[in-house]
Amino acid sequence: MLLAAVLQAAALAVLLTLTPRLAAARWCSRAPASALLLWQALGLAGGLLALEVAATAALAPAGPDHLAALRALPRPLPWWALAAAAVGTAVLARLLWVLVRSTVRTVRLRRRHRLLVDLVATRNPLLRETSVVDSAHPVAYCLPGLRPRVVVSRGVLTALDEDELRAVLDHELAHVVQRHDLVVLPFVALRATFPRLPAVCAAVEQVALLVEMLADDRAARRHDRGVLARALSKVGGAQAPAGGLGATTSGVLLRAARLLHPAPPLPHPGRLAVVLAALAVALLPVAGVIVPLA
């Protein structure tokens, strides 16, 4: 089982090494959905492998049979087995606690902000179900959830023409329909658990950028790409409030350039290769459990 722990640690190290390469890969902007799937697989596999390393090391003295290991651990336990078990338990508990805390905090923030928007915002029948807040600062964002809201400021209505405004609104509706908030939330919790790990910080940044690209692509199906890029540049300094997703929160210049000078989509064989790679990465933790049983 010590060999299994070494193999699991090696697999985790490989994932951490590959993260910067994936963050710098240019093909991701050509297939954001496929890239996002791969990032999700990396996040899942990395978190589970970190737990498996500690658990496998803790059970190593008892041999390869996990059930027998629970009954046959030596008394007293070696200090390193106790340390490994404590670290694994602490990491798991912190990860679950941060995930629950982040989820509850985000839900509360959105509920509070939604109530505030309903109190102070006005509705414009020409803008569908969009809430308009009285602020000169140009900002557009959505509040996802069971009762979503798309919010724009009067500054946006002043800064954008009609076509640009409708493009931005469709971008925000894409976040709502595709539930991008559920994609981002686990990575935010992972960063809160491992705040000093560069690979985790890179993953959060890239996932945020990719969901914005997906929303851009959905909006670009109904609107001119140049119009959307121009709208992003006009409100590019805005920041969505906590709990919200905004059209201008991640990589505005990169996204505008992508809209104005679109690269050809990643060919189907390339997308298939990415999906297979994501599947292989997601199965690494399963292999980490099977190997000790072999």
Question: Where in the sequence are the language-model features?
Answer:
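Hydrophobic transmembrane alpha-helical segments in integral membrane proteins
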Residues: 1-14
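Membrane-interfacial entry segments at the cytosolic side of transmembrane helices
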Residues: 268-276
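Membrane-interface segments at loop-to-transmembrane junctions
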Residues: 30-42, 70-76
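Polar-ligand-bearing catalytic/cofactor-coordination segments
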Residues: 18, 22-35, 84, 92, ...
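Juxtamembrane boundary at the C-terminal end of a transmembrane helix
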Residues: 283-294
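Membrane-anchoring signal-anchor transmembrane alpha-helices and their immediate flanking context
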Residues: 13, 17, 26, 36-37, ...
